[in-house]
């Protein structure tokens, strides 16, 4: 690989790192909101809201199409995030 290509890759990776930092900040904000909602839940069976999950995924698909983003990719990302937050809520609920 040429020196120029290596430099281009490094520059692009630095941009990705900046985006990753922004994503981490958003995850922190999202987690704070999840914590606020979790504090209102009285029963463990309130953690998984299948209807809400379905609506979220439908909206993400629609928005992804509008932005010309691969809908399979965004579906997988959101599905993974939802699973992660469900596990997070279950873990935190046990400590209530």
Residue ranges and their predicted role:
Residues 1-96:
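Domain-level signature for soluble enzymes in the chorismate/prephenate branch of the shikimate pathway
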């Amino acid at each position: 690989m040429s020196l120029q290509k290596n430099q281009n890759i490094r520059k692009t990776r630095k941009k990705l790192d900046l985006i990753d930092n922004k994503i981490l900040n958003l995850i922190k904000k999202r987690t704070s909101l999840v914590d606020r909602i979790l504090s209102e839940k009285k029963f463990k069976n309130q953690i998984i809201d299948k209807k809400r999950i379905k609506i979220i995924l439908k909206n993400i698909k629609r928005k992804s199409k509008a932005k010309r983003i691969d809908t399979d990719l965004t579906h997988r990302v959101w599905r993974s995030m939802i699973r992660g937050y469900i596990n997070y809520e279950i873990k935190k609920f046990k400590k209530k």
